[in-house]
A protein has these predicted regions:
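Core catalytic alpha/beta fold that binds nucleotide/phospho-ligands
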Residues: 1-201
């Protein structure tokens, strides 16, 4: 396992874990969390679940917060300790987690995507609005970037808003018109884009 810090301040941390060995034997993963792995999951899904939890624990420890099991709540969302808000995302061989102190952040979200993965117009048209489609066609943003931005925003909003959102509902360009306190930023790592999103208190 290879651990990288993408962002670290006194109130928020973003950690990334890359596959380097069989991490299912990783000692830092708590037994309570490995019991959440479902038998029907593929070996890759099992591994990325553990990698995501390792990234999350690393972020929690970076902030000096209590390192407790990160269990699963409704819809499989992670349950964080009382002093933390967080989000996890992963691809086949890489995982990221963002954790913020709950006295500073109301909610956070994160998404990771491979920049080399290109979406056809018939694919990104399923989740993009007209302005987003125009920005793709003009080469300002890629379909993958817009998808990742929407995922990070969606993960942020779903923890504080009872409305049910779809990717089509999320405006990844003019999001602050509807959510003025929402902050979105992108970190580039190798061939990956990591979009982080948060709402401060």
């Amino acid at each position: 396992m290879f651990d990288t810090t993408l962002l670290s301040t006194s109130t928020i941390a973003v950690k990334l874990v890359e596959e380097k060995k069989d991490i299912l034997t990783e000692e830092r993963v708590l037994l309570d969390e490995t019991s959440l792995i479902k038998d029907k999951w593929s070996p890759v899904r099992q591994k990325t679940f553990i990698m995501g939890r390792i990234a999350a624990h690393n972020a929690v420890r970076t902030l000096g917060l209590e390192d407790i099991p990160i269990l699963r709540g409704r819809d499989g969302m992670p349950i964080w300790g009382k002093d933390a808000v967080g989000s996890i995302s992963h691809k086949d061989t890489i995982a990221v987690a963002i954790v913020g102190k709950s006295d500073v952040y109301q909610c956070v979200g994160i998404d990771i995507e491979d920049m080399n993965f290109l979406l056809a117009k018939e694919e990104y048209s399923l989740f993009c609005n007209e302005e987003e489609i125009k920005s793709i066609e003009e080469g300002l943003l890629s379909g993958t970037m817009i998808f990742s931005r929407k995922e990070a925003i969606l993960k942020t909003l779903c923890t504080i808003d009872t409305n049910v959102y779809t990717l089509k509902d999320i405006d990844s360009i003019n999001f602050q018109k509807k959510h003025p306190k929402l902050y979105l930023s992108c970190i580039y790592y190798k061939s990956y884009i990591v979009n982080i999103c948060y709402i401060s208190k």
